[in-house]
């Protein structure tokens, strides 16, 4: 639990931009979902073993940390990659666009779990990356915006 306490302090001090708790799908799925959410790309470290990239990671966390704050983290960590502005996933010689990855991810079970009802009611969902909003405001889509992340620290 000491690591979670340190993580909580790192978050309070602004050294962590975002976090994702791994599950049975491991780093690959976690990093992909984080990228889908923010619209940025990811360059995975060349020395990361592919077996580790796809292995279950129960209890592990992926953190997005500003480059200038990595060395000041108080938790034990391993750098697995970096966020890029090019909207691509890259590892070694392999590269895939974020758009292609999203299509593969959403299209796999499209016949079973439809994401398009075929009806057009005029409403359209869009991926939006990094818009600045005033703290504590609700935008035109009904989304609440905050710069504060709260983590339960009483357990």
Give residue ranges: language-model regions.
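Intein/HINT protein-splicing elements and their conserved insertion hotspots or analogous self-processing inserts
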Residues: 1-55, 67-155
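Short hydrophobic/aromatic beta-strand micro-patches
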Residues: 62-66
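A structural-propensity feature for long, helix-poor, extended segments
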Residues: 57-59
């Amino acid at each position: 639990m000491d690591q979670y306490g340190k993580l909580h302090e790192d978050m309070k001090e602004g050294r962590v931009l975002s976090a994702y708790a791994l599950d049975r799908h491991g780093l690959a799925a976690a990093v992909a979902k984080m990228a889908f959410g923010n619209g940025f790309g990811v360059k995975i470290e060349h020395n990361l073993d592919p077996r580790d990239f796809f292995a279950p990671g129960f209890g592990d966390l992926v953190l997005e940390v500003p480059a200038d704050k990595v060395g000041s983290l108080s938790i034990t960590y391993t750098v697995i990659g970096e966020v890029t502005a090019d909207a691509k996933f890259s590892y070694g010689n392999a590269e895939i666009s974020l758009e292609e990855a999203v299509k593969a991810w959403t299209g796999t079970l499209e016949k079973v779990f439809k994401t398009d009802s075929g009806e057009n009611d005029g409403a359209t969902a869009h991926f939006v990356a990094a818009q600045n909003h005033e703290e504590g405001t609700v935008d035109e889509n009904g989304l609440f915006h905050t710069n504060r992340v709260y983590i339960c620290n009483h357990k």
